[in-house]
């Protein structure tokens, strides 16, 4: 595929300009337009675990005028920016906020020198780490001279809520409010609850639903004996969501709020944050009082989605620019004859449908293989383990499909391996030089992508996180243990996806309309069924209050599959345009493997 001279360079330049603009806007929202200082940091627990944090410090907070503090714990698998909604809104109101990963998640992980494996060869994170990590963060936050340690708030989403309630119980003289978002765990009842408490949980919270009888059963959560005991209700009394029990002004306030949202959406839902701000307003006087309805955090969500799209555009255009340079021009081989099914014929549509199914049918099953609680080879990779299984099964399925196509169609037409994109030259021979240059190309492209992200990350002090998709810097302790492993396990899907698509997609040069159609087809093959699975999962939870795939935590796959969709769209876009330009899968394979490994290592990085 020839690129009109300068088009790729212009696209790359525009993506960089827009990236700078969006980064500035993200900094503006995150810092309340300069009124709040934001910093990143790490603590080390007694077990040698890195505790990654992000801190928001209003410029009004000082030694002479200390501000109340908020310790926020994000949910399992998330990075610190999953707490941005609460951090932005609390810091706008003058609070010092510290958001941390649950140890074993995000960028909080055991140092490589202390990671060990059990008798089943599973990576072990000390069980005391999550509790110790949140306690360590709380002690650090309250030790800061500009924090009023007598006016503290703790809370978090999912696992973060479970561990911060333990912190609150350990510091009942200091903590004025504990809020659990999507977590019906209330610590140790014997320690008491001498602080205000709010449970904010979606009516369609799939995690809570699956822990009950799994259908329209959120009332089981509200009428839980431990929760009613905390609220001062008897066994025969009903707890009414939306009703305030006790008095928040006297630190005896209790409330359950039930916005209509899902577990994975709760930290991004305006109504959830407004309920938190209402409880905060009723609990204490903050330095900069604002109505609970005055929120701006959603703008960061929109901007981050834009940055994820720009990352895709930047990497794709950079690849095209590099391929037009003298160094890498020889990677562009002559177009090969198309031996695939006739476009728009009945058999072509059938083949596209088969490819769509093959790319998505195994994802929930794969999730259940690592979610049953029974250790196996892939559980060592945490939440990324099921994606390895999915890649293996999908790659094998696409290999069988390709073999059947070749036996029934390709061989009769004189199709050769080079016509599947395996060529390394135009003479039909294997050229090691071509492979070496493709590897060099991949290293440079990945360095450009990583450099682009790191410039963004250290400038904005934010990762790229949208619900279940996340990109972080690659932690050194994961680089050898997981990054190279993810490249290996993602190889079957990345390789066979490029090969199998040649049975239905023309990658040679064509008119713009044909290119757009081919790109849409290519993307649909990779992600259409995955997206449908996620939408069916979400629809059942949101509208029918039912968690499908409850067995062996298959619902985790229902949630996480959208992260696979976003990551796959990025790598398939890069790969599609590289395939069009090079007419070979090798530059595409080498260039996209490190990208997909990066996404798998840092997205949903739960490691226990």
What residue ranges belong to the model's regions?
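A domain-start/cap signature at the N-terminus of enzymes
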Residues: 3-13, 17-47
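Alpha-helical transmembrane segments of multi-pass membrane proteins
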Residues: 19-26, 316-321, 358-368, 454
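Juxtamembrane interface at the cytosolic side of transmembrane helices
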Residues: 309-352
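Hydrophobic H-region at the start of alpha-helical membrane spans
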Residues: 8-16, 307-311, 351-353, 394-397, ...
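Short, Lys/Arg-rich N-terminal segment immediately upstream of the first membrane anchor
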Residues: 1-6, 338-344, 428, 432
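Juxtamembrane/start-of-transmembrane alpha-helix segments at the extracytoplasmic/lumenal side
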Residues: 294-308
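Soluble extramembrane regions of membrane proteins in the secretory/endomembrane system
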Residues: 28-297
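Alpha-helical transmembrane segments of integral membrane proteins
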Residues: 351-608
């Amino acid at each position: 595929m020839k690129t009109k001279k300068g088009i790729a360079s212009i696209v790359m330049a525009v993506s960089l300009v827009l990236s700078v603009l969006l980064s500035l806007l993200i900094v503006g929202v995150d810092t309340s337009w300069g009124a709040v200082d934001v910093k990143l940091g790490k603590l080390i627990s007694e077990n040698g675990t890195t505790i990654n944090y992000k801190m928001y410090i209003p410029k009004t907070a000082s030694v002479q005028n200390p501000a109340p503090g908020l310790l926020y714990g994000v949910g399992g698998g998330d990075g610190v920016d999953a707490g941005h909604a609460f951090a932005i809104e609390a810091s706008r109101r003058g609070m010092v906020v510290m958001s941390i990963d649950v140890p074993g998640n995000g960028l909080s992980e055991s140092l490589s020198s202390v990671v060990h494996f059990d008798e089943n060869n599973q990576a072990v994170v000390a069980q005391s780490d999550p509790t110790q990590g949140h306690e360590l963060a709380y002690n650090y936050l309250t030790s800061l001279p500009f924090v009023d340690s007598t006016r503290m708030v703790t809370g978090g989403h999912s696992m973060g809520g479970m561990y911060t309630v333990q912190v609150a119980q350990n510091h009942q003289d200091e903590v004025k409010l504990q809020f659990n978002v999507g977590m019906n765990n209330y610590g140790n009842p014997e320690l008491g609850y001498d602080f205000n408490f709010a449970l904010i949980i979606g009516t369609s919270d799939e995690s809570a639903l699956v822990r009950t009888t799994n259908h329209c059963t959120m009332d089981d959560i509200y009428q839980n004996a431990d929760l009613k005991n905390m609220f001062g209700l008897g066994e025969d009394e009903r707890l009414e969501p939306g009703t305030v029990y006790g008095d928040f002004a006297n630190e005896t306030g209790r409330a359950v709020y039930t916005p209509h949202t899902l577990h994975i959406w709760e930290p991004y839902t305006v109504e959830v944050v407004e309920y938190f701000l209402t409880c905060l307003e009723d609990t204490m006087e903050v330095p900069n009082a604002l109505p609970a309805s005055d929120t701006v955090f959603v703008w960061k969500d929109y901007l981050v989605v834009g940055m994820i799209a720009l990352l895709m555009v930047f990497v794709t255009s950079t690849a095209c620019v590099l391929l037009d340079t003298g160094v890498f021009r020889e990677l562009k081989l002559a177009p090969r004859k198309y031996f695939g099914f006739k476009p728009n014929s009945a058999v072509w549509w059938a083949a596209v449908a088969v490819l769509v199914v093959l790319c998505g049918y195994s994802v929930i099953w794969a999730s259940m293989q690592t979610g049953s609680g029974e250790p196996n080879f892939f559980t060592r990779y945490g939440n990324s383990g099921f994606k390895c299984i999915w890649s293996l099964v999908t790659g094998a399925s696409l290999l069988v499909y390709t073999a059947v196509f070749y036996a029934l169609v390709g061989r009769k037409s004189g199709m050769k391996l080079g016509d599947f994109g395996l060529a390394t030259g135009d003479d039909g021979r294997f050229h090691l030089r071509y492979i070496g240059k493709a590897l060099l190309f991949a290293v440079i492209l990945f360095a450009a992508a990583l450099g682009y992200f790191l410039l963004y990350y250290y400038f904005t002090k934010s990762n790229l996180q949208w619900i279940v998709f996340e990109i972080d810097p690659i932690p050194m302790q994961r680089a050898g243990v997981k990054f190279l492993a993810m490249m290996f396990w993602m190889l079957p899907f990345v390789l066979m996806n490029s090969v199998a698509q040649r049975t239905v997609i023309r990658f040679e040069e064509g008119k713009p309309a044909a290119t757009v159609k081919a790109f849409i087809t290519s993307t649909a093959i990779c992600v259409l069924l995955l997206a449908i699975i996620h939408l069916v999962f979400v629809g059942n939870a949101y509208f029918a209050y039912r968690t499908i795939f409850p067995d062996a935590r298959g619902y985790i796959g229902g949630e996480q599959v959208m992260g696979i969709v976003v990551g796959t769209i990025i790598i398939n876009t890069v790969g599609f345009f590289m395939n069009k330009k090079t007419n070979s899968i090798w530059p595409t394979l080498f260039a996209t493997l490190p990208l997909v490994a990066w996404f798998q290592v840092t997205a949903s990085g739960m490691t226990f």
